[in-house]
Amino acid sequence: MSVMQFSGLLVVWLLSTLFIATLTWFEFRRVRFNFNVFFSLLFLLTFFFGFPLTSVLVFRFDVGVAPPEILLQALLSAACFYGVYYVTYKTRLRKRVVDVPRKPLFTMNRVETHLTWVILMGIALVSVAIFFMHNGFLLFRLHSYSQIFSSEVSGVALKRFFYFFIPAMLVVYFLRQDSKAWLFFLVSTVAFGLLTYMIVGGTRANIIIAFAIFLFIGIIRGWISLWMLAAAGVLGIVGMFWLALKRYGLNVSGDEAFYTFLYLTRDTFSPWENLALLLQNYHNIEFQGLAPIVRDFYVFIPTWLWPGRPSIVLNSANYFTWEVLNNHSGLAISPTLIGSLVVMGGALFIPLGAIVVGLIIKWFDWLYELGNREPNRYKAAILHSFCFGAIFNMIVLAREGLDSFVSRVVFFLVVFGASLLVAKLLFWLFDSAGLIHKRTTSLPQAQVEGKL
């Protein structure tokens, strides 16, 4: 890459970043937080944060990258995607009407709410315990991270249930919403994330997500400022780098440490070059249509229920890894959101996918606002826990693609909904047995619903 080519890419990167950052800043000033703000920051991180890191790798360490014209296509496709997404998100198909009283779809009381978070926490802890009994501390047993996906490790499906510890702790926080509950959320979820990091052998997702939710709650409540958020972001990047070194068993120093920091940070937070690799091999891609979305559900179906289930799931990430990169190391390489759309339907699917994502984020913001307006604090805690708990799925959306997001959000919805139903069933059984008594302390009517 010549200096002139880099200068052209830099101009496009600056304009695109300024465009997205400006819209995000105006939205932040208007509402302080919603899921449009979160997705916009996540989109910036995924598709634009890595450009400076790539530039240093190219000019400082002479690392090979995709041709400049392909990198330009990656930057422009990301900017155009966001433009279509933003227009979709802001477009209102019908006039806003004054809210009229409607019969609620469901209600929650104190006992049901506490039962819900206990059930969610129980799902996570029992899954961790069973996985640990089968495998022990994988971080100290395995020699490479790819071994996590080998036959040496049993009960891999249980990892999908670990995450429900976070929405459980979110319910606890939203019932109190003070600084002590906020700090308790951080300590409990990060401690659980470190435990799963050691047990699973290097999975950092629970730690990253817990820390991100903690920061956004702090921003919403005004407990942390923007400069504190930036400082926490730097601390988070350094922390994730250290955990990555431990995960891959790397011992580096000097220039090698700087080089390792650059490429690990880029791959962890901003795998934008993966999109460039897909575009570089565009002529070799056999478009998969919507099949990757259907295939991604296969991993949630146990073999005892479907004995003939394919052992290899060809979703967009695996197609990119195996068919495009010809990489069979055992790790799936993230194609990114836009990359998954390219795998499914080429360039035509990029604006269509942007419209779909705009509607998805709009729905989450509608649910979040519903929780903000809800007078029943127990129901509000459940709604907010569901919304913030889905942040993990939005990270999957940006990094892994639309197919992975759809399967995971459906799985999250099913488990969360089942926990609610079980909590209501248990409350009904306890109430029928005469074990539920009304509280003697008088509370505001808006905070009391049903028998407490």
From Swiss-Prot:
Please list every transmembrane segment annotated in the UniProt record, as residue ranges: 6-26, 37-57, 63-83, 118-138, 155-175, 181-201, 207-227, 228-248, 341-361, 378-398, 410-430
Asked if the Swiss-Prot or TrEMBL record annotates the protein with the keyword Cell membrane, the reply is: yes
Q: What Gene Ontology cellular-component terms does the record carry? A: plasma membrane
Q: Which UniProt keywords apply?
A: Cell inner membrane, Cell membrane, Membrane, Transmembrane, Transmembrane helix
Single biological process term from Gene Ontology: enterobacterial common antigen biosynthetic process
Query: What is the membrane topology noted in the UniProt record heading this document?
Result: Multi-pass membrane protein
Pathway entry: Bacterial outer membrane biogenesis; enterobacterial common antigen biosynthesis
Its annotated compartments are:
Cell inner membrane
Subunit structure as annotated in this protein's UniProt entry: Probably part of a complex composed of WzxE, WzyE and WzzE.
Family named by the database record: Belongs to the WzyE family.
What function does the entry list? Probably involved in the polymerization of enterobacterial common antigen (ECA) trisaccharide repeat units.
NCBIfam families reported for this sequence: PRK02975.1
How is this protein named in the record?
Probable ECA polymerase
> From what organism does this protein derive?
Salmonella choleraesuis (strain SC-B67)
* Primary gene name: wzyE
